[in-house]
Structures are given as structure tokens and as C-alpha cells.
Curated annotation (Swiss-Prot):
Protein's name in the database: Pyridoxal 5'-phosphate synthase subunit PdxS
Pathway(s) where this gene product acts: Cofactor biosynthesis; pyridoxal 5'-phosphate biosynthesis
UniProt xrefs under NCBIfam families: PRK04180.1, pyridoxal 5'-phosphate synthase lyase subunit PdxS
Chain sites annotated for binding D-glyceraldehyde 3-phosphate: R174
Protein family per UniProt: Belongs to the PdxS/SNZ family.
InterPro entries: Aldolase_TIM, PdxS/SNZ, PdxS/SNZ_N, RibuloseP-bd_barrel
């Protein structure tokens, strides 16, 4: 699909059911950030269900500063050509033209990501205008439901990307799960009040109350660096994990990647997790999230 739409050409769109179904296929797996075709192959060989193609992992984006934008199309296409598993790529929040470009390149999923510098401080992209399913981050249930109302087919609890510190991932996933549990058993009057409090459509709030979960897949992200971290997020209710800097900023990326996949699959078996954690080399150097100023907290981006 061309990223430039003529006045008489309606954008190609896909149904929410189809896009959500595509995301369902990733449940139980690990999605890994990669910056080269070689890294993408390592991720695929390790058992990743998808890769995220980007020029810099979050740890490097955090270190380098400046404006972080969509990755170069040649780099993305190189990764698409290197692997048989799905390829995701990031667009800036509200930058629907970057999303159009990514769709034209043939990526399998678009991540409207707070890790990149937001392009719009008021609006997120209209995700119903695309055939390609979108992934979006959330720190709480209201944020998750607002993204779903815009057409997101997958939610990831944000965590704090590029820190190697799982504490914010735990906080955000627990927040979402606790708020979902709170809605169980609410009557209509209480659901209307909850929708107002969450700043989310009543119909979605009611659906979550009835299902006892989000109507889309919920993964966890931000700070997962070890097999135990991945298993922790799964035991807390994540249906899969994103791993960014934690693999290719470690001492032995191939071994760590395979270990995190194994721990994500067998997340409720401590013996397997222990075996997967042996002799992995050095983990990435972590950051204490308490030391991050508000302006450097990626999770605060989005509304």
C-alpha cells in the first residue's frame, strides 16, 4: 500500500476482529528488539515469536538523547527479509504518516511507542485507518482502554524501557490487572461511574467487567532482563513479554535469548527457570528507576 493516499482513494482498513486475531497468535511468546538482520536471526533461532526492528534499542535511545524517530526503511526491510517470523516496527505517538510508511513496507505490526519522541502531545494515531494491527503501551486500565478505543489490537504494560529494571513493568501490570478485578461484579450504575473515572468508553468498560480481562492480548514490557523477570511477568498475568535492551546488551545474547524464551514458556516451573538462568554471562547494566527525572521517564508519554 502506498503511504500517499489520493483524495479519491479511501485507505485500506482491516476489521478489529482480524487484527486482534493476528495478535492472539503471539500469546505465550517473547518479542525481541533487534537492530540488524543478524540479531533478528539470533532471536528467531532462540524461539522469539516476533522481532521489533529499530535502529537503537531503548538503552541507547536513553543514553544518546535527542529526538528518536521511526527507523530507516532499508533497515526495516533488511530485517523483514532475514526472518520468517513476524516483524514489528515503531512509530512515534500521533505520527500517522510514519505509521503509513511502516504499513507500506509490509511490517506485520506497528508499535505506536512512547520510546520514540512523541509527534503529537494531544492525539494518538487513528489505528482503525490501517490494515496493519497496532501495539500500544499503557500504565493503567484507562490508558489501555483509550488505546483500544482508537483501534489497538494489543496492549503492553509499559514498564520503563531501557533500564533493565523490572519494577515499573510489575507496577503497571499489577495496576491494570487490579483495576480489571475491581470492575468484576459492578452494576451498570457503577460501570458508568467507572467509565467516567477511567476516561474510557462505557461499552469497553462493560466488556472488560464481563470478560474479566482486556478484549485484546496483554503483554508486558520495559525492564525485563533475566529469565526470572520474564517468568515473573507471566505469573502476574502477562500473556507474553517484550524484551528490548535486556538481550543484546548482555554478555551472551544468543544464550540469554533462548533462556528467556524457555522461562516465558515454562513460567510456572521454578526448576526449569533455574536451569535456564545458569551461566548466562553478565546481564545488562541496570538503572535505578527512582533516579530518573520525570522528563526521562518514557512511561509518562501518552495520554
Amino acid at each position: 500500500m502506498s503511504s500517499t493516499l489520493s483524495e479519491n482513494q479511501a485507505p485500506e482498513t482491516g476489521t478489529a476482529r482480524v487484527k486482534r486475531g493476528m495478535a492472539e497468535q503471539l500469546k505465550g511468546g517473547v518479542i525481541m528488539d533487534v537492530v540488524t538482520p543478524e540479531q533478528a536471526k539470533i532471536a528467531e533461532d532462540a524461539g522469539a515469536v516476533a522481532v521489533m526492528a529499530l535502529e537503537r534499542v531503548p538503552a541507547d535511545i536513553r543514553k544518546d538523547g535527542g529526538v528518536a524517530r521511526m527507523s530507516d526503511p532499508d533497515m526495516i526491510e533488511g530485517i523483514i527479509g532475514a526472518v520468517s517470523i513476524p516483524v514489528m516496527a515503531k512509530s512515534r505517538i500521533g505520527h500517522f504518516v510514519e505509521a503509513q510508511v511502516l504499513q507500506s513496507l509490509g511490517v506485520d505490526y506497528i508499535d505506536e511507542s512512547e520510546v520514540l519522541t512523541p509527534a503529537d502531545e494531544v492525539n494518538h494515531s487513528d489505528k482503525f485507518a490501517f490494515t496493519t494491527p497496532f501495539v500500544c503501551g499503557a500504565t493503567n486500565l484507562g490508558e489501555a482502554l483509550r488505546r483500544i478505543a482508537e483501534g489497538a489490537a494489543m496492549i503492553r504494560s509499559k514498564g520503563e524501557a531501557g533500564t533493565g529494571n523490572v519494577v515499573e513493568a510489575v507496577r503497571h501490570l499489577r495496576q491494570i490487572k487490579n483495576e480489571i478485578a475491581r470492575l468484576r461484579g459492578y452494576d451498570n450504575n457503577e460501570l458508568y461511574a467507572a467509565a467516567k473515572e477511567l476516561r474510557a468508553p462505557y461499552e469497553l468498560v462493560k466488556e472488560v467487567s464481563e470478560l474479566g480481562r482486556l478484549p485484546v492480548v496483554l503483554f508486558s514490557a520495559g525492564g525485563v532482563a533475566t529469565p526470572a523477570d520474564a517468568a515473573l511477568m507471566r505469573q502476574l498475568g502477562a500473556e507474553g513479554v517484550f524484551v528490548g535492551s535486556g538481550i543484546f546488551k548482555s554478555g551472551d545474547p544468543a544464550k540469554r535469548a533462548a533462556a528467556i524464551v524457555k522461562a516465558t514458556t515454562f513460567y510456572d516451573d521454578p526448576k526449569i527457570i533455574a536451569d535456564a538462568s545458569r551461566n548466562l554471562g553478565e546481564a545488562m547494566v541496570g538503572i535505578n528507576c527512582d533516579t530518573l527525572p520525570e522528563t526521562e521517564r518514557y512511561a509518562n508519554r501518552g495520554w
